[in-house]
Amino acid sequence: MLFSWPYPEAPIEGYWGKPTSLIDWCEENYVVSPYIAEWSNTITNSIFLMTAFYSTYSAWRNKLETRYILIGMGFSLVGIGSWLFHMTLQYRYQLLDELPMLYATIIPSWSIFAETQEILIKDEKKRKESSFRIQMVISFIMCGIVTILTWIYVVVQKPAIFQVLYGILTLLVVVLSGWLTYYHVHDSFAKKNLFITMVMGMIPFVIGFICWQLDIHLCSFWIYIRRTYLALPLGVLLELHAWWHLLTGTGVYIFVVYLQYLRILTHGNPNDFLFIWRWGFFPELVRKGLPIGTSYSLEYLGPIVNTQVDDETKKNN
């Protein structure tokens, strides 16, 4: 095939030396560059950096609570740490890959756990009075969870245990946020948008998880296909752990948008915000009065709003 070349036969000693990480993924090391151990697994972390940057910027621009700025910054650290880990396969950078995943996820976990406790208080006055106390109690619990999981990862050095417990924490966030949406969002149109956004955020995670497991359990098969039929550079497209990065990076962004809108509907002032679908399919929360700049719809794949006419209407009002 034109513009293709075979994989090297012998293992290559790269710039970073022998791997010291507890995990070495299916992607063969240093086959594309002597400076990057796992090429595809490294560069696909760009998706975390891009979505985290936009999520942070959007939270700041829309004057959302600080928690959402911290969530965006947290997931940018995940992208940086994962980049360094897959580039070097050194243990010290492995810690910067998986531990920031925990620390970034703890923030939305704390937020949704506190929201759930607050919303169970029916009296509005008591709810406001108890809000700070509830958030502080949940904060201490979250700190305890972080400490235990960090100890498991660093001292016990059992990534599988860490990953299972982290998965349970993430699942709790999904279940509780779904419960809040179903029982405590009463606007049917908003609820529909919420559930669609929630599902759109979850589907990439599920597909990505399948890719991750296939990469682990059928590694020799993928290596055979890459070496025998694809060669380089096409082989880099069949690195399933890299697809895990792309899919979860997208899913994280969408799910954070879902959590933002859920928070506004249950604890904020929804009249100050507009939930839009850029180009009819990409969800985003926008504070009213701010320019949107692209075509959008108010429901998934719904009628496209003419932004020029919409902007003129806002000016006249």
Swiss-Prot record:
The keyword Hydrolase applies. InterPro entries: ACER. Residues 122-133, 263-317 are cytoplasmic. Residues 1-35, 57-67, 89-98, 157-160, 182-195, 217-239 are lumenal. One of its GO terms (biological process) is ceramide biosynthetic process. GO terms for molecular function: N-acylsphingosine amidohydrolase activity. One of its GO terms (cellular component) is endoplasmic reticulum. It is an enzyme of class 3 (hydrolase). Residues 36-56, 68-88, 161-181, 196-216 dip into the membrane without crossing it. It catalyses: N-hexanoyl-sphinganine + H2O = hexanoate + sphinganine; sphinganine + hexadecanoate = N-hexadecanoylsphinganine + H2O; an N-acylsphinganine + H2O = sphinganine + a fatty acid. It is a multi-pass membrane protein. Disulfide bonds join C26-C219. It is found in: Endoplasmic reticulum membrane. Keywords: Disulfide bond, Endoplasmic reticulum, Hydrolase, Membrane, Transmembrane, Transmembrane helix. Its EC number is 3.5.1.-. The keyword Protein biosynthesis does not apply. The chain crosses the membrane at residues 99-121, 134-156, 240-262. Its main location: endoplasmic reticulum. It comes from the Eukaryota. Acyl-CoA-independent ceramide synthase that catalyzes the conversion of dihydroceramide and also phytoceramide to dihydrosphingosine or phytosphingosine. Prefers dihydroceramide. Very low reverse hydrolysis activity, catalyzing synthesis of dihydroceramide from fatty acid and dihydrosphingosine. Is not responsible for the breakdown of unsaturated ceramide. May play a role in heat stress response. PANTHER family: ALKALINE CERAMIDASE 3. Belongs to the alkaline ceramidase family. This is Alkaline ceramidase YDC1. The lineage of its organism: Eukaryota, Fungi, Dikarya, Ascomycota, Saccharomycotina.
